[in-house]
Regions:
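Hydrophobic alpha-helical transmembrane segments
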Residues: 1-175, 179, 187-326
Length: 326
C-alpha cells in the first residue's frame, strides 16, 4: 500500500511542482559520485582499451548497487521509526524520480521563443535539452528537436522510473536513475568514453528495453485520450519503432510522429559531426511549433494512463499473492 500511495502522490507532486531548486536532487549527488568514481577508477586501471572498459564496468556494477543499498536502508530505517515516515521518504524519492513537469517546462520555453519569433533564443533553449548541435537549426529543426526530446524522454523521465518504482518502490526507482545518469554522463561513443562508458550504455539499454515499449503503447493511448490520430500513431509505432541507433529511443518518437502526422529524426549534427539517421513518421502535415504543445499534451495523458494502469496492476498482484498465501 505504501508503494502505491507513494507512486501516485509522487506523480501528482511532479505535475504540480516539478523539481524545485531548493530541494537537493538525488541525480545531482549521483552525478558527483560518477565523476569521483570515474577519476579514481581511471587512475587505478591501465590506460588501454581493456583497462578503460574494466574501469567502466566496475563503476557500472558498484554505483547502482550502492544507490540501491543506501536508499533501501533509509526506507527500512524510516519504516522502523514509523510507517508514515517511510511513506514520506518514498513519496519524496518517487516525486524526484519523475521529470514530466521539467520536460514540459523546458519544451515550453522553446515554444514561447518560437511563438515570439526569437529563433536564436529558441536555439539556445532547445540546446539545453538535446545533444545535437543547434546553432544552425531553422524553426522546423528547432521544433523537431523539442518534440523528439519530449517523446524520447517520456521513457527515461516517466515510464522507466514508474516501472521500477511500482515493482520495488523508490529504492528501485533510484537504482534505475543511477544507471540512466551514468549513461547520460559517460555513455558516449567518443574518444573519452568509447570503452569506459560502454558497460553503462549497454546496461541502460537493457533496463529501458521493456519500459520503452510500454511507453510507446502508453503514448498511443495518450494520443487517443487527447484527441490526436491514435490509429496512425499505432501504425507508425509498429513500423518505425526500430528506426534509431538506440533500441529504445524510437519507441515513443514513432508513436508521437504518427499521432501528429509529421516526420521526425533524420540527419543531424552532433559535436560538429554529421550523422545520417533514418526518418521516423510520414510528412502528412507540416511541422509547426504548435506541435511542441501537442507533444506535451500527449505526454501528460500518456503519463496519467500509465500511472493508473501501474497502480491497478500492482494492487491486483498484491491481492492475488495475499489470496494465494491465505
Amino acid at each position: 500500500m505504501i508503494i502505491a500511495i507513494a507512486v501516485v502522490a509522487g506523480f501528482i507532486m511532479d505535475i504540480l511542482f516539478g523539481d524545485p531548486s531548493w530541494i537537493r536532487h538525488p541525480v545531482v549527488i549521483m552525478g558527483k559520485g560518477i565523476s569521483i568514481m570515474e577519476n579514481a577508477l581511471r587512475r587505478m586501471f591501465p590506460k588501454t582499451d581493456r583497462g578503460e572498459f574494466a574501469a567502466g564496468l566496475v563503476m557500472t556494477i558498484v554505483l547502482p548497487v550502492l544507490v540501491l543499498a543506501v536508499t533501501a536502508g533509509v526506507c527500512v530505517a524510516a519504516y522502523m521509526v514509523h510507517p508514515g515516515l517511510c511513506l514520506a521518504v518514498e513519496t519524496l524519492w518517487c516525486w524526484q524520480a519523475f521529470s514530466m513537469k521539467g520536460l514540459k517546462t523546458e519544451s515550453m520555453n522553446v515554444y514561447r521563443c518560437l511563438a515570439e519569433g526569437e529563433l536564436n533564443d529558441s536555439r539556445k533553449a532547445v540546446g539545453r535539452i538535446v545533444g545535437r548541435d543547434t546553432a544552425n537549426l531553422d524553426e522546423t529543426g528547432v521544433t523537431k528537436a523539442a518534440v523528439e526530446t519530449v517523446a524520447e524522454n517520456f521513457g527515461d523521465g516517466v515510464m522507466s522510473p514508474l516501472v521500477f518504482m511500482i515493482i520495488g518502490g523508490a529504492p528501485l526507482a533510484m537504482f534505475y536513475k543511477s544507471i540512466n545518469t551514468m549513461d547520460s554522463m559517460v555513455g558516449y561513443k567518443n574518444k573519452r568514453f568509447l570503452f569506459f562508458g560502454r558497460a553503462a550504455a549497454k546496461l541502460d539499454d537493457f533496463v529501458n528495453y521493456i519500459p520503452a515499449r510500454l511507453g510507446g503503447i502508453m503514448w498511443v493511448a495518450g494520443a487517443m485520450l487527447s484527441g490526436y490520430d491514435y490509429r496512425n500513431s499505432w501504425r507508425i509505432w509498429r513500423r518505425d519503432r526500430r528506426n534509431h541507433a538506440s533500441p529504445n529511443s524510437a519507441q515513443t518518437e514513432a508513436a508521437c510522429a504518427g499521432a501528429l502526422g509529421i516526420r521526425l529524426a533524420g540527419p543531424a549534427y552532433y559535436f560538429g559531426e554529421y550523422y545520417e539517421k533514418p526518418y521516423i513518421g510520414d510528412a502528412i502535415n507540416e511541422i509547426s511549433y504548435e506541435n511542441i504543445r501537442d507533444a506535451d499534451r500527449m505526454m501528460y495523458c500518456a503519463g496519467i494512463v500509465a500511472v493508473i494502469l501501474a497502480v491497478t496492476v500492482r494492487a491486483a498482484a498484491v491481492m492475488i499473492i495475499s489470496a494465494a498465501g491465505a
